[in-house]
Amino acid sequence: MSKQEKYAGASALQGLSLGQQSAYISQYSPALLQPVPRSLNRDDLGLTGELPFQGCDVWTLYELSWLNARGKPMVAVGEVSVPAVSANLIESKSFKLYLNSFNQTRCDSLEAVQAMLVKDLSACAGSEVSVTLFPLAQAPHHIAALPGECIDEQDIEVDCYEFDANLLQGAAGNDEVEETLHSHLLKSNCLVTSQPDWGSVVIHYRGPRLDREKLLRYLISFRQHNEFHEQCIERIFTDLKLLCHPSQLTVYARYTRRGGLDINPFRSDWELPPTNLRLIRQ
């Protein structure tokens, strides 16, 4: 059974603006924000008690504009961090529509807009969300490279594009290492619309050495898989812990932007999130 079929009757997905024609409201409307319970996929992963990781979902906002007190348009770039312990993730299309609602709204200052975002996003997520807005001249603009070794250049024949955690069976070697690996070949699909989500993923771990071919095949198997960005990264973390037994693990993905937003989920049992620096595809 596909993830779409599995979640087809989920009440949490009913009424989402995602996949529907939407009116673009240009006056401030926090009611546009829509939460999705994280339990929707965490129950499936057995994550019903204390979480085995900490982390956050870091969003970058590229299309944010409002009017100042005199009616002149203002623009900024934003960084939002939603804690992984929050009850809900924030549905991305509703986030975009919410940001658009600032377009014809008069606000006294950048700080006032930032405070509105903190209040509304925290209410949607069910936990305190941090927001930083940058005037364009102060916005981070460096294009970064992922840390560690890329596993994408392996010359392998691939024929499995349906998600299969069993591709990690036997991926844990005998020698203990600490290493960082990354791949740019992560691709999954939106749970509701099946639109492609393109990402790059970093895996930093201590424990039995990972078989890089098996790891790459596993990551490629997400190619026809339907789940939200955040859910995919928690699935990768959980599968690696269960099947490869690292003593310490970080899984961090950076997805390409859609609708002026990019989502960058970070999950770890031993590290804090890195600086939010975009990749070449972002």
UniProtKB/Swiss-Prot annotation:
Active-site feature positions: C190, D197
Keywords: Cytoplasm, NADP, Oxidoreductase, Queuosine biosynthesis
Major subcellular site: cytoplasm
EC number: 1.7.1.13
Entry binding sites for NADPH: S92, K93, R258, G259
Subcellular location: Cytoplasm
Highest taxon, organism lineage: Bacteria
Residues spanning the membrane: none
GO cellular component terms, A-Z: cytoplasm
Gene3D superfamilies, alphabetized: 3.30.1130.10
GO biological process, any: tRNA modification
Class of enzymatic activity (EC top level): oxidoreductase
Catalytic activity: 7-aminomethyl-7-carbaguanine + 2 NADP(+) = 7-cyano-7-deazaguanine + 2 NADPH + 3 H(+)
Binding site for substrate: I90, E91, S92, H229, E230
GO MF: preQ1 synthase activity
UniProt key word Oxidoreductase: yes
Assembly, per entry: Homodimer.
Protein's job: Catalyzes the NADPH-dependent reduction of 7-cyano-7-deazaguanine (preQ0) to 7-aminomethyl-7-deazaguanine (preQ1).
NCBIfam families: QueF
HAMAP family assigned to the protein according to its UniProt record, in alphabetical order: QueF_type2
Family: Belongs to the GTP cyclohydrolase I family. QueF type 2 subfamily.
Protein name: NADPH-dependent 7-cyano-7-deazaguanine reductase
Species this protein is from: Aeromonas salmonicida (strain A449)
Gene that encodes it: queF
